[in-house]
From Swiss-Prot:
Protein name in UniProt: Mannitol-1-phosphate 5-dehydrogenase
Organism ancestry: Bacteria, Bacillati, Bacillota, Clostridia, Thermoanaerobacterales
Species, as recorded: Thermoanaerobacter pseudethanolicus (strain ATCC 33223 / 39E)
EC assignment: 1.1.1.17
HAMAP family, per the entry: Mannitol_dehydrog
Gene3D superfamilies cross-referenced by the UniProt entry: N-(1-d-carboxylethyl)-l-norvaline Dehydrogenase, domain 2, NAD(P)-binding Rossmann-like Domain
UniProt keywords, alphabetically: NAD, Oxidoreductase
Length: 388
């Protein structure tokens, strides 16, 4: 049986990546920092994926085990034997995962000659490159040559909503997911054979990554931040609001025009994708909280993420990203007290002023037209929703 090692045994790891790897015939070793989660996986040796739709379905995932990330002996054995390594740990953690992998791959190099593919399945642009660079960073010439010859590092675009929904479970490690999923993999970077059921191998990944980042992640964040301002708890409630849905649909249209021009994609295909995204947001079975979707606003409002990237692309090609900027402005009004990044943004606005805070997070110059437009939208939304 083929063997997979997956870093990150959370909801995405179990409900999406692990689910498809199991369906593709892999035995899966999850690696995680949580001792409790590792013990649970090893105790139950299986879990259920609950697919949330009108007729709820349940699929069992078996042939699994787990290793704590500090269990060097067993993790070393797993890496040596692996046919594929994947991650869903958050892009901010890839550097540290790469540093650990470097040491284990040196052991693998001394013990086995078979090819390996390593993929970071994260909500970030070209996340596998981040992981690869971390692995190679302190490697000697011999190690770098081995990695380049024997290990493939395909970038990926992954998409499945896995909310923290309160639902009856057979096992504590069961996970609930939406019916939709998409996993696009960079074909040219694969070494050897890679067959993952339900994944699509593509020649040029960038259009897929940006389509998902702008039209799904950007729209999701906009729905969350505006929904928070209007007092909604769930995404499916927020997207039913005419004011919010109008802004979200129009920001998708702005981003679609920019994507169409950049990548020569048919605009009708992007509009169809956008409509499917809105339909997914309306899924009331997900009970996806706006504060979950809006969390970590410093990252989501940064210059190379889901809102600023399409805004800058629009501006570059002569489109005023009016509705994308509403999402960005709403993000700076997201003051959820249990989110450390949201609290820090509000403190910075109070201590250093709005313009300096926006500039610091987005990377825009304080005197730039885009920043001034964000300030205008911020003041408009603040006045409308009386945020103090």
């Amino acid at each position: 049986m083929l063997k997979a090692v997956h870093f990150g045994a959370g909801n995405i790891g179990r409900g999406f990546i692990g689910y498809l790897l199991y369906k593709s015939g892999y035995e899966i070793t999850f690696v995680d920092i949580s001792k409790e989660l590792v013990e649970s996986i090893n105790n139950y040796k299986r879990y259920n994926v609950i697919i949330l739709k009108d007729n709820v379905e349940k699929e069992e995932v078996k042939n699994i085990k787990a290793i704590h990330i500090e269990d060097e002996e067993n993790l070393s054995k797993a890496i040596v034997d692996a046919d594929i390594i994947t991650t869903s740990v958050g892009a901010n953690n890839l550097k540290s995962i790469g540093e650990k992998l470097r040491n284990y791959l040196k052991i693998r190099k001394a013990n086995i000659d078979k090819p390996l593919n390593i993929m970071a399945c994260e909500n970030a642009l070209f996340a596998t490159n981040i992981l690869k660079n971390s692995i190679l960073e302190k490697g000697d010439k011999d190690f770098i040559e081995y990695v380049n010859q024997k290990i493939g590092f395909p970038n990926t675009a992954v998409d499945r909503i896995v909310p923290n929904v309160d639902i009856k479970k057979e096992l504590p490690i069961d996970v609930a997911v939406e019916d939709f999923y998409e996993w696009d993999i960079e074909k040219k970077a694969i070494i050897g054979d890679l067959n993952i059921k339900g994944a699509e191998l593509v020649d040029d990944l960038e259009p897929y990554i940006e389509r998902k980042l702008f039209l799904l992640n950007g729209a999701h964040a906009t729905t969350a931040y505006l929904g928070y301002l209007k007092g909604y708890k769930y995404i499916h409630e927020a997207i039913q609001d005419d004011f919010i849905r109008n802004i979200v649909s129009k920001m998708q249209e702005e981003a679609s025009i920019a994507l169409s021009k950049k990548h020569n994609i048919k605009i009708d295909n992007l509009r169809e994708y956008s409509n499917k995204v809105i339909k997914r947001f309306k899924n009331s079975y997900l009970k996806d909280e706006v504060v979950r979707v809006g969390r970590e606003p410093t990252r989501k409002l940064s210059g190379n993420d889901r809102l600023m990237m399409p805004a800058k692309l629009c501006y570059e090609i002569g489109i005023t990203p009016k509705f994308i900027l509403y999402g960005i402005a709403a993000g700076f009004l997201f003051d959820y007290k249990e989110d450390p990044q949201a609290c820090k943004i509000q403190d910075d606005i109070k201590n250093f002023g709005l313009e300096k805070t926006i500039s610091k997070i987005t990377g825009l110059e304080e005197n730039s037209d885009l920043l001034h437009e964000i300030v205008k939208k911020y003041k408009e939304l603040k006045e409308t929703f009386r945020k103090r």
